[in-house]
Amino acid sequence: RVLFRSSIFMDKTTQTQIIKLIHQEVIPAIGCTEPVAVALAAAKAAEVLGCKPEKTEVFLSANILKNAMGVGIPGTGMVGLPIAVALGTLIGKSAYGLEVLRDLTPEALAEGKQVIEDKRIHIALKDNVDKLYIEVICSAGDETSRVIICHEHTNVVYVEKNGVVLTDRRKEGVSCDASGDEDELRLSFSTVYEFAMEMPLDEIRFILETADLNRKAAEASLKGNFGHTVSKTVSGVYGRKYMGDSAYTHMLAMTAAACDARMDGAMIPVMSNSGSGNQGIAATLPVLSFAEDIECSEEQLIRALMLSHLMVIYIKQSLGRLSALCGCVVAATGASCGITYLMGGDKVQISYAIKNMIGNITGMICDGAKPSCAMKVSSGVSTAMLSALMAMENKVVTPVEGIIDENVDKSIINLTSIGSKGMEATDKLVLDIMTGKSC
């Protein structure tokens, strides 16, 4: 097998940049991040307006619209964008970021329903914009406000009141250009691996927060019946009878539990990754569950979680925030790296796990955020375990097979190119199907 050259560990500046990047990308979120980001823009627009709007107009990119149509909104028992927008304008606080709706009350929910009934919210598709684009215009009498979020879920790039521009960061290149910031630290497989394996433990211990928060989400899910109850199915009578009771089924059940609750609109915070709560869940809980089953050390858990989360961030750098490719493919690839490491795998075997993942479930489409995402996450976790097992046996999808390259970084670029470029027509067709249904 091809061995990697050893290298001197990275300089302090790069270490600091990576830690900053992780803190930017791994953050708490309540509810699916797309409708929550729309609620955030609505909250900001209402704050700028200075009063409750009489009318709210929302213009969204296709990917935002797709991911917000069928998912539960936390604490409402309702699905979709109108209630997210209404609550954003009524009780949302932009300072809360992706927890913008955490002050929800029954009274506010009732008021939000009335706003919808009065047809004071109008939502439309906006063409030829970034894949992550949210524009909200609020009005009351002669007063108006306008807010644009672009490229990232909390990235407010434009604020206007009564025709006067208060903020316009588009001119600074913060922009709605999906290529992102040219000064952004660009990761590689070796950088990710070396950082996770060699950083002083106390400097990366913070990644345990992902385990604490996402475990609580999984535990809370088991107290009710959320979504399609994928987790309870795996651990139920038939699940135990036909799938058994093992480290494998434990990680399936724990991961699906958090996703079941989140996609059904439970008021449960999770630690997200790269703008996605499901990605944060899938990068965390399979690794945590497996670590607990094999009773590994705290250091091993920290390094496995860091490897998983940073790998997801790396892959998302070239894939982009939103795409036609299901995010669980990316997140489960990170999890497979963490699991392989916990099995005792070395750098080469971890690279094998990545190639095995790419050779298996590349092409799984994203057809919006919804309760059935828990099934897709479970498929990703299942493949993560299989890929790790094969890697430990030094079995890997070879460069003569499909999109796999001898170089692991090139294999990742092949994956993300398919997701960001090759599946654009798929993305459009999926949205056409979703918006054309009678239900």
Pin down the residues of each PLM region.
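Short, small-residue-biased leader/transition segments that mark boundaries at the very start
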Residues: 1-3
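Early transmembrane hairpin of solute transport permeases
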Residues: 39-138
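Flexible, glycine/charged-enriched surface loops at secondary-structure junctions
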Residues: 52-56, 96-101, 123-124, 202-208, ...
